[in-house]
Amino acid sequence: MADHLILSLQAPPFLIFPCSLHRSWRFPGGIRYSVPEFRLSSQLQLANSISPSKSSASSSSPPENSAPEKFDLVSSTQLKDGSHVFRFGDASEIEKYLEAEEKARCVEVETQNAKIAEEASEVSRKQKKLVSSIIETSTEKEETAAPSDLSNVIKIKDRKRVRSPTKKKKETVNVSRSEDKIDAKSASVSNLSSIVSVAEAIPISSTEEEAVVEKEITAKSYNVEPLSSEAMKKVSVNKIGDCETNGYQENRMEVQARPSLSTQQEITPVSTIEIDDNLDVTEKPIEAEENLVAEPTATDDLSPDELLSTSEATHRSVDEIAQKPVIDTSEENLLNTFEAEENPVVEPTATAAVSSDELISTSEATRHSVDEIAQKPIIDTSEKNPMETFVEPEAVHSSVDESTEKLVVVTSDVENDGENVASTTEDEITVRDTITDSGSISNNDDTKVEDLQLPVPETASLEPIKAASGREELVSKAFYLDSGFASLQSPFKALAGREDAYFISHHNWIGIADGVSQWSFEGINKGMYAQELMSNCEKIISNETAKISDPVQVLHRSVNETKSSGSSTALIAHLDNNELHIANIGDSGFMVIRDGTVLQNSSPMFHHFCFPLHITQGCDVLKLAEVYHVNLEEGDVVIAATDGLFDNLYEKEIVSIVCGSLKQSLEPQKIAELVAAKAQEVGRSKTERTPFADAAKEEGYNGHKGGKLDAVTVIISFVKIVST
């Protein structure tokens, strides 16, 4: 074979030509071909090819007049050294190659189509499964919901059947058994025991709802004989039906104790019962809904001296409370007066039995006007504490403001001029009638309140005053800061970004920082470090569970957590009660103004002139920080600012602006804006005398005059007090 395979007229199936890119080749026939020509030509013809070797082996050379064979470029490959390898073949071989390539492509397309069809079928199967599962779950829910709906329908039907209009006219009530009936005409003490047993048999449920309907059993009206001033109690049995508790109905009995009003009134009670002194006291509590309440009967003609329970009186208007004395039946107040074992009282959680010791007698004084009640002493008949007076605790349902303004007093001798008693908009006189251990004042006792004479303690009227002063001593004062801020950039440095940063947190924390502008020469944002430093301080204060109060510790932790490059001055202040704690590093500062004068201010910290002390990563804040402690009063003004304020305005100028703004009742935000604007206005001046010009002159820079135009950030805080 020749040096180049292309010279062989009977070439192997593929002709391989190594060559470099754009390298020309000369064939013996004088035709030159380059690499691009090989690539672009679809078919090459070699004619008049003569072997360069003139050897005698003519067997490898074609005949001289043989026709040129057609061949085409099959592929080209670039090697690592930059050379190219071309593969040529005749027409039949190229056709075979193309057919094989087409078959491979068809197989690949069919494979992809099969995969797509399989995926589509899988998705459709999943969708069918999902739809079927949803249908099954919905069917199950409907099946499970059907019984509950049916029970509700049954309950509603039962409820309608129970609430028949004929029930209102009946004089007896059937409870659980037909033989347990209460005759409203002939009820006696023996019937009360059956009522108690029925009440105890009521099922108790934690989920018991409030009574929806309360049906009173009315009896025929009849006149009650006058009982003079003896105490009389009416016990009514109310049937509360149709209460749905845990899916079943239950009937509950509510025992209500009501005081009698006048002796010659027509009363429509359920039953009037004379309480037996020998009746055993049962202290088994029922549900909270079945409380013994003292309320007037709806069918009575109410007089102005109507007695109200404590729970009702708290929901009445001020005018109604002013006209009516209140019987306090709360457990807390009565237990403070008497022993619980000897004098049981009507508690919010009602007891099943009603004994003579549980009745609160109504004194003769309740039938007089408010002025007469105020003038008459309230007599305590208890044997143990005959001279004891009380101060009623604050009502549960009243607000904090009402409880501080109202003074509830029970005393045997109240000194007043009549006007305060008539108004009674601020003071309530709670009338209490107590009973003795032996039951000397009872329903059957003829002893009257007017006949009882007990000594009146002279110091009784002083106890409410002591209690009121004690409540005043509990009122504490909390100090807080009402703050506003203003931050103005330097016109010359506005393009480089904001260099100042600040924060205000929880009405008792403020902070301010001034980034060092020289960092901008190194391509670092001069304000990034200051902003991250203040942001970390605010996070530490907000997230601190132990309520950290030392500003030095806050600044120390913030420096350790700050990752940005740069440096900054910093000032952190914290108000703890009335003491202001400040940690300062650099030429930012603070001042406290009280009554138009400077109470306290900070001193700038410099390495030398125009080179303030600053903090950066790795600094020991505990050693660098300068700490201040200032005791504040209400009305003081705290100012924290960067050097842009203190370099351009003297302290007396700042005080003048603040005091003038206070006279105009301006808010801290507005004052901060005025102070910052004035500082930048002076900073633009070339002639005014400024603190910065004075400092430059002291350092030997006599040529500088006027202000120093710089960024200004100011926080103005008013010290205020809130009562707790």
Swiss-Prot record:
Binding locations of Mn(2+) 2 = 514, 643, 710
| UniProt catalytic activity | O-phospho-L-seryl-[protein] + H2O = L-seryl-[protein] + phosphate; O-phospho-L-threonyl-[protein] + H2O = L-threonyl-[protein] + phosphate
Name any one Pfam family assigned in the record: PP2C_2
UniProt region (Disordered), positions on chain = 357-385
Q: Which GO terms describe its molecular function?
A: metal ion binding; protein serine/threonine phosphatase activity
UniProt keyword terms in alphabetical order: Hydrolase, Magnesium, Manganese, Metal-binding, Protein phosphatase
Give the top-rank taxon of the lineage listed in the UniProt record for this protein: Eukaryota
Q: Which residues form the PPM-type phosphatase domain?
A: 482-719
Q: Where is the composition biased (Basic and acidic residues)?
A: 365-374
Q: What is its EC number?
A: 3.1.3.16
Q: Does the keyword Magnesium apply?
A: yes
Q: Which cofactor does it need?
A: Mg(2+); Mn(2+)
A GO term from the CC aspect: chloroplast
Binding residues for Mn(2+) 1, per the UniProt record?
A: 514-515
Q: Which Gene3D superfamilies match?
A: PPM-type phosphatase domain
Q: Which family does it belong to?
A: Belongs to the PP2C family.
Task: Give the PANTHER family listed for this entry.
Answer: PROTEIN PHOSPHATASE 2C (PTHR12320), PROTEIN PHOSPHATASE PTC7 HOMOLOG (PTHR12320:SF1)
* Name of the protein this chain belongs to: Probable protein phosphatase 2C 62
